[in-house]
């Protein structure tokens, strides 16, 4: 697969979900996450995020999430949509039509944007914005930095144009976290995979 360090086998994924349930965590709906971010939580909650909109997600994880109505954010990079190994816009719209499924912004190219100029970065985001409006009718308000990497300029630009942004550094989200540098934990490819998430 393209990014093996952040992929997960479907049976391992299902097992992780069951562990979360048995540990008395609830699944946070992204709408509630946005509205209640500044409110301290008494209960343990998990927000599921999925990057890249691979076809494998649609064929394997999506049926399970749909059956169980588990809320999640699917972060989409607009350039690869419809290419080999990636979901189509029709499939993305199908997912997005469910009230528990949310589409997030993951740039246009999914390049290492931190290595590009500030102008190139802005052009990439703006191109994705135009495609999102054409295909979905809106620009997603949640952003995920490609490869979890960002500069101060990128963070500041995203903060002016989105509601929240996620990296790939590990950590628990609480009200003291920067809304545009939110951490995430990886659900890893196999149960004994390495602990580091690097792509």
Where on the chain are the PLM-derived regions?
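N-terminal pre-catalytic segment of deacetylase/amide-hydrolase enzymes
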Residues: 1-46, 199
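Short secondary-structure boundary segments
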Residues: 147, 168-170
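Short, electropositive alpha-helical surface patch
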Residues: 125, 154-166
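Metal-dependent polysaccharide deacetylase catalytic core of the NodB/CE4 family, i.e.
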Residues: 1-4, 43-46, 55, 66-153, ...
């Amino acid at each position: 697969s393209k990014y093996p360090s952040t992929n997960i086998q479907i049976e391992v994924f299902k097992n992780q979900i069951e562990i979360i349930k048995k540990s008395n965590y609830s699944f946070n709906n992204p709408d509630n996450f946005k509205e209640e971010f500044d409110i301290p939580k008494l209960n343990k909650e998990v927000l599921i995020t999925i990057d890249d909109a691979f076809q494998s997600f649609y064929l394997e994880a999506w049926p399970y999430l749909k059956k169980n109505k588990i809320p999640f954010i699917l972060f989409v990079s607009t350039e690869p949509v419809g290419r080999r190994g990636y979901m189509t816009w029709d499939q993305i719209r199908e997912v997005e039509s469910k009230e528990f499924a949310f589409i997030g912004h993951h740039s246009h190219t999914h390049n290492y944007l931190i290595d590009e100029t500030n102008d190139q970065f802005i052009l990439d985001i703006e191109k994705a914005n135009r495609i999102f409006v054409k295909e979905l009718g809106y620009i997603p308000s949640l952003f995920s930095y490609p490869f979890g990497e960002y500069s101060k300029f990128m963070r500041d630009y995203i903060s002016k144009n989105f509601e929240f942004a996620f990296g790939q550094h590990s950590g628990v989200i609480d009200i003291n976290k920067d809304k545009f540098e939110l951490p995430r934990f990886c659900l890893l490819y196999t149960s004994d995979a390495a602990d580091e998430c690097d792509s």
